């Protein structure tokens, strides 16, 4: 049996049995954990409000034989309560935590991804994260997962994308027009879109115009769904609240 404390962000939480919950956490030092919170649905004192998605916690963990993880207690560090009052901010936060949950494997430490997600949620809560910030977050999260799309050169031949570039999720990003014949699922994209995404990938924070931002969101949605094997549920929720 091993006991330890760690910093954590709640990625998801589901009911289990009559009184318990299973909580998926992204921890700073131990990576993604799915922990059993006994009596969480009945105890108003022990886990009061702590197990909701995108809560920032200090968690008390017990790991037993067979890799069973038990959540023994929590201390709320940040609830991001201002963000929880705005439906559009809730939608972005839920998307961010779902993306991180799907991009990570259990028990693989991801301190950089933890810091990235915590920083994004903090900026959302302070209303400092504009619409383009979500694209920047996605690109950084994909980079941490080793799934960085290619925007600066053709994913097939390595040459310049050219004046009539295309994008193909199966081949990892941009393809030039000649290679587009082989990339049957590729779609034509504006040069300005690839340039804008490449700038975000390199750390620029210049906002994209709404029309390019919408195209970029569409490309990344398809790219992520292809590599994960499914569409993220929170994408539909973002659409319902009018987000790109």
Swiss-Prot record:
GO CC annotation terms, alphabetical: bacterial nucleoid
Family under the similarity heading: Belongs to the RecO family.
Function in brief: Involved in DNA repair and RecF pathway recombination.
Species name: Myxococcus xanthus (strain DK1622)
HAMAP family: RecO
Name the record gives this protein: DNA repair protein RecO
GO BP, one annotated term: DNA recombination
Xref: InterPro entries: ARFGAP/RecO, DNA_rep/recomb_RecO_N, NA-bd_OB-fold, RecO, RecO_C
Keywords: DNA damage, DNA recombination, DNA repair
Domain of life the protein comes from: Bacteria
């Amino acid at each position: 049996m091993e006991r330890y404390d760690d910093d954590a962000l709640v990625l998801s939480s589901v009911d289990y049995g009559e009184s318990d919950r299973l909580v998926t956490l992204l921890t700073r030092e131990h990576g993604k954990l799915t922990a059993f919170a006994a009596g969480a649905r009945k105890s108003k004192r022990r886990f009061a409000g702590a197990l909701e998605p995108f809560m920032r916690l200090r968690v008390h963990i017990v790991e037993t034989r067979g890799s069973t993880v038990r959540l023994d207690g929590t201390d709320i560090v940040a609830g991001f309560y201002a963000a929880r009052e705005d439906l559009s901010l809730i939608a972005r936060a839920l998307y961010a935590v779902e993306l991180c949950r799907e991009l990570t494997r259990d028990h693989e430490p991801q301190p950089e991804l933890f810091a990235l997600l915590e920083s994004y949620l903090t900026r959302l809560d302070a209303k400092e994260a504009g619409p383009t910030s979500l694209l920047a977050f996605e690109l950084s999260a994909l980079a941490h997962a080793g799934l960085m799309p290619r925007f600066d050169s053709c994913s097939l031949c390595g040459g310049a994308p050219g004046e009539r570039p295309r994008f193909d999720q199966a081949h990892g990003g941009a393809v030039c027009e000649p290679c587009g014949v082989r990339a049957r699922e590729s779609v034509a994209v504006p040069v300005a879109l690839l340039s804008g995404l490449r700038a975000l990938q390199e750390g620029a924070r210049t906002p994209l115009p709404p029309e390019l931002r919408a195209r970029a969101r569409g490309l990344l949605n398809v790219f992520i769904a292809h590599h994960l094997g499914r569409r993220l549920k929170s994408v539909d929720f973002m659409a319902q609240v009018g987000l790109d």
